[in-house]
């Protein structure tokens, strides 16, 4: 919301307006971010795009001037942090070991209401892998006020800062998220990523088969197993299905 507020003020006061990460589209107008980015793109003087796909989407909206593909500043920052920061105390503080847990971040309204949280948590009960969930206070209040059962393997921790988040991303086995920012970070770090959304702005990680949109129909446990394409004993996921089904899956 601060993005569109600042953009409107700049436009009204005739201040030169540059939109970084322009052209991102989910085409889901129920997302507040989608409305903000659409409006900001159409009133900006200079549009700096993180992906070529964003440039193409702006062309479809007849925004062709002062549009530049400059690359992803978020990934430049992540690379810098990976090169300069390696304090893994967040792992010991939460009794975690490298490559032995999944990282989950969900915060969007359609995933954090009582009904959906119960459904997601019910599915997580079938996963025989620790799932670390840095939880937003609003989501925590929903869980507590509705007495939602927390699966044994789900470890709720307090929200973490950016540096510690990169450590969790770098040391986890795979990621479950509905975050926009985590998706390209997972791709950059070669961490398989299950996106708890029906659409996404980040197309490249999908095309490269690093990330996948959850279909909200298949059992989450089975969906993860099929996506990772590894033997059942390697990912420690118990889906209560015949072991023969997984014998031919490639590591």
For each of these PLM feature ranges, what is it?
Residues 1-62:
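Active-site and donor-binding regions of nucleotide-sugar-utilizing enzymes
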Residues 19-20, 47, 168-205:
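A donor-sugar binding/catalytic signature common to diverse glycosyltransferases
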Residues 53, 212-251:
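Leloir-type glycosyltransferase catalytic cores
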Residues 49, 68-69, 155-159, 211-217:
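Short acidic-hydrophobic, aromatic-tinged amphipathic segments that line or gate anion-handling sites
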Residues 49, 69, 134, 176-177:
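Short beta-strand scaffold positions
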Residues 86-171:
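Donor-nucleotide binding loops and adjacent catalytic segments primarily
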Residues 40-112:
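A nucleotide-sugar donor-handling region in carbohydrate enzymes
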């Amino acid at each position: 919301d601060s993005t569109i507020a600042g953009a409107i003020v700049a436009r009204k006061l005739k201040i030169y307006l540059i939109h970084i990460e322009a052209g991102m589209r989910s085409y889901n107008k129920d997302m507040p971010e989608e409305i903000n980015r659409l409006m900001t793109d159409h009133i900006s003087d200079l549009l700096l795009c993180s992906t070529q796909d964003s440039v193409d989407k702006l062309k479809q909206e007849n925004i062709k001037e002062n549009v530049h593909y400059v690359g992803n500043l978020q990934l430049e920052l992540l690379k810098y942090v990976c090169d300069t920061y390696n304090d893994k105390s967040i792992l010991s503080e939460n009794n975690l070991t490298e490559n032995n847990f999944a990282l989950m971040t969900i915060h969007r309204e359609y995933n954090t209401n009582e009904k959906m949280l119960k459904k997601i948590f019910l599915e997580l009960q079938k996963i025989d892998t620790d799932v670390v969930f840095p939880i937003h206070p609003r989501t925590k209040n929903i869980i507590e006020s509705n007495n939602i059962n927390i699966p044994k393997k789900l470890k709720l921790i307090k929200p973490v800062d950016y540096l510690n988040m990169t450590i969790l991303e770098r040391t986890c086995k795979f990621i479950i998220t509905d975050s926009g920012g985590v998706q390209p970070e997972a791709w950059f770090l070669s961490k398989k990523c299950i996106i708890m959304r029906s659409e996404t702005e980040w197309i490249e990680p999908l095309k490269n088969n690093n990330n996948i949109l959850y279909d909200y129909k298949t059992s989450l446990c089975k969906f993860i197993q099929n996506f990772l394409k590894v033997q059942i004993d390697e990912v420690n996921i118990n889906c209560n299905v015949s072991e023969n089904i997984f014998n031919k899956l490639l590591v």
